[in-house]
Amino acid sequence: PEIIDLAKAAKDANCDAPKKPHMILSNYTTPKASHVLLANVGSGSTFFINIDSRAIVGCVNTVGGFNGVGGTTNAHASVASPDNSMAIVANIGAKDESGFLHKIQTNYTSDDYKLVETLALDQFTNELGTAVARPICHEFTSDSKFAYITLAGGGLLVVDVGSADGTTPMTVVKVYDKDTVPGIGCGVSRLPFNKIMTNGESGAKGGDDFLYTFDTSKAVEGVFPNPVQIELPGEDTHGAVTCIDQKGDIFGITSMRVSNDVNFVDLQTNKVVATQSMASSFSPDPKPDVAHIVGNKMFIALRGAKPLSAIGSLESADRTPGVAVLTISDDCKSFSWEEEDLASMNDSKRMVTLKDGSEVSASDPHGLE
């Protein structure tokens, strides 16, 4: 694989070195994406990286927030709007405290990026039914007017994102409480037909996991129906992508990080139609995380032996950190993968020690696009 030294690239761009690069997502320029947005969950910064040159062409640190409203180093995900006018950063906040949403005005032609607004989320805890409101991931509706925000304690916020320059502020227009949307909030995908798909995961301890689909078609009218809730087999749903079968039907494919399963969900009937394990002789404990699909190839980040986030309590020398490339069947109900379909990211120069004393690679992949 091509390797980019982010510390050097940041220095070359007059940006501070990143800590814990986490989620990487592209913008929506045509005919193809021009930039990716990299959220650094240990340093509170978002890097804007030119895809062709691989250079960091902008960096925005959201620690402290706009006009001191608030913001920590925990910038979990930075997502571009479909019209490319803004990006919203989900800032988890400090441990046991509520987080923030930051708005960055974006211009990918001039590489001009500036923080214009911060929204504190502690004011929504009562409606959510949670002690804190910690945003995890989000996605915009196709018209770039609303963002659906998942939360660590369950529940979901729908935000009218306002204007790109911040003169019209972000406003929460719908609160789904934790009983309506249970589970640790995770990834969000925009589906056809004005729908948004999210996950509700059980985390490292296991428990109930869900896939949700939200009808956004009447959001501009202030109508927000309750989501369709689909219970998932396995433990700790995380990555989710979609697949179109030979008949044109759409399926959700979800990776279960703790139990190493992949679920196939018929989104016409809202039923799980197949579950398949990723565990194999060449990857006994893969720990599949964030996923992306191109054609019939599903790319999944596989976590490391000593995870840096979320499942840090689950150590194992049987991990194979890297990227798995699954070939999805034409009917979107199964996958195949072989040892040659694993792009290893093991790094023998950087080792860590597990609780059992074994020495393993420090590599711990997470986001991919």
Where are these regions (language model features)?
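Predominantly soluble domains enriched in secretory-pathway, periplasmic, or organellar proteins
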Residues: P1-E369
